[in-house]
């Protein structure tokens, strides 16, 4: 039924948030709303907020205020992590009409209808940390991506790293029923998607609350016809055992592209962060992956300037990163997050020092990434093509190998969602390699 109303959504934050934003978009579409870009006039604006840093809180507030400025008469909905952790602040904000916390996003339509009936400010934020919660099922019938679909299979985190607010924003681990996951994967395969990415707030914890486990879920997804590639979201190092890696290596659809969260290469820093592994365990995980997969892509996250990080500790981290030799590293300068233990730790590192250390590791990341990709020059690979790319007056199509190396094929034809085999001949741009078909 067409209701002659327009809705616009804006996502802030992680892949899980992006999945939930897409699900809310489909809820509104199915109810008859016309979805328009967030920069356009709309009757309803939904901002799925983020709270991972104080800056994320600020950006969330800015986007909510921007929505109200675009149409003062619009219903502005604040959803997600910022309003979950700052409920009172959000409820006092005159620009926000409806506040929806985590695990309640599926009630968006009902909240809109209730607001329109009596025009009173609505808040629906549960105490996500002290009530036993079930997984919030939000089903995607389609996705804005063209070849690769992200599937949320887990929510919540039980780790409580000293710098992180997410366990308080997302609550305890909640795993999605595997049957619901497979039903969604099959639907996406029917719509032509050939690559699936399993994602969650703490993916490695999948099944700890239900008696299931991540490996079993991966095997189930692997059995779905039409899906030809499976990628995994961020993994905890301790999940990587010989048994786990050997099982993955026996599944041909698995992409040898693994994101193992590290944060620091110094054990003393890891202890202050309350990370539940040491550098020896982490390195063993990388060695295991390299034993079962040929030249796997291993990527990671690193925080520089964590409270108490001395020059000596940073030097230890840098040497460790060089030894592991990652494909890609996401480098973050430590940012105080109100409400975390790290925010009140002594020996906070000055901002100029954080920036200097970040620049050092960014240069190292660039060098290691180039070395990893250069390995494939002269080798035959298969890439799943995604989109057209214009370069120096020529038309190419770009895509990714299983290891997530971006390549380009010279072609005026539409190659999207097709597998193309060829030999990598060299570099087209700084981060795109040229592949010749055969």
Regions found by a protein language model. Name each.
Residues 1-205, 219, 243, 248, ...:
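Proteins enriched for Cys/Gly/acidic motifs involved in redox and nucleic-acid/cofactor modification
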Residues 6, 71, 224-231:
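Short, surface-exposed connector motifs at secondary-structure boundaries
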Residues 54-55, 203-207, 238-239, 305-308:
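Short, small-residue-enriched loops and turns at beta-alpha junctions
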Residues 160, 164-171, 230-238, 264-275, ...:
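Conserved strand-turn element in the central/C-terminal portion of the radical SAM core barrel
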Residues 190, 215-216, 223-229, 241-300:
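Radical SAM/AdoMet-radical enzyme domain recognition
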Residues 260, 301, 321, 329, ...:
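Hydrophobic, well-ordered secondary-structure elements that form the walls
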Residues 309, 324-326:
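Contiguous mid-protein beta-loop-alpha structural module that forms a pocket-lining wall or clamp
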Residues 344-438:
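Terminal RNA-binding accessory module
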């Amino acid at each position: 039924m067409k209701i002659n109303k327009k809705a616009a959504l804006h996502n802030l934050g992680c892949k899980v948030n992006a999945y939930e934003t897409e699900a809310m978009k489909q809820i509104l579409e199915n109810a008859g709303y016309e979805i328009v870009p967030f920069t356009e006039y709309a009757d309803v604006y939904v901002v799925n907020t983020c709270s991972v840093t104080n800056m994320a809180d600020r950006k969330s507030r800015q986007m909510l205020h921007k929505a109200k400025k675009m149409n003062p008469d619009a219903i502005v909905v604040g959803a997600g992590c910022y309003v979950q952790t700052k409920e009172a602040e959000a409820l006092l904000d005159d620009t926000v009409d409806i506040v929806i916390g985590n695990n309640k996003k599926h009630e968006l339509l009902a909240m809109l209808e209730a607001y329109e009936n009596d025009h009173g400010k609505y808040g629906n934020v549960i105490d996500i940390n002290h009530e036993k919660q079930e997984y919030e099922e939000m089903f995607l019938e389609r996705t804005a991506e063209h070849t690769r679909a992200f599937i949320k299979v887990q929510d919540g985190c039980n780790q409580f790293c000293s710098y992180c607010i997410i366990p308080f924003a997302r609550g305890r681990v909640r795993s999605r029923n595997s049957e619901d996951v497979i039903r969604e994967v099959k639907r996406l395969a029917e719509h032509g998607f050939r690559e699936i990415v399993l994602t969650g707030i703490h993916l490695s914890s999948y099944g700890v609350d239900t008696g299931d486990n991540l490996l079993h879920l991966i095997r189930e997804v692997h059995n779905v016809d039409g899906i030809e590639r499976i990628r995994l979201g961020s993994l905890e190092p301790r999940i990587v055992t010989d048994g786990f890696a050997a099982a993955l290596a026996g599944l041909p659809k698995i992409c040898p592209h693994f994101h193992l969260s590290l944060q620091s290469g110094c054990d003393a820093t890891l202890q202050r962060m309350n990370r539940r592994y040491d550098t020896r365990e982490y390195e063993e995980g990388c060695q295991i992956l390299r034993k079962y997969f040929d030249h796997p892509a291993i990527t990671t996250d690193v925080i520089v300037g964590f409270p108490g990080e001395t020059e000596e500790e940073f030097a230890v981290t840098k040497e460790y990163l060089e030894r592991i030799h990652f494909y890609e590293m996401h480098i973050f300068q430590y940012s105080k997050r109100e409400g975390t233990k790290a925010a009140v730790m002594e020996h906070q590192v000055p901002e100029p020092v954080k920036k200097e250390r970040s620049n050092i590791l960014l240069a190292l990341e660039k060098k290691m990434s180039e070395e990893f990709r250069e390995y494939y020059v002269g080798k035959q690979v298969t890439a799943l093509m995604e989109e057209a790319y214009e370069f120096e007056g020529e038309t190419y199509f770009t895509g990714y190998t299983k290891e997530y190396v971006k390549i380009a094929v010279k072609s005026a034809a539409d190659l999207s969602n097709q597998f193309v085999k060829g030999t990598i001949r060299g570099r087209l741009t700084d981060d795109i390699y040229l592949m010749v078909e055969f």
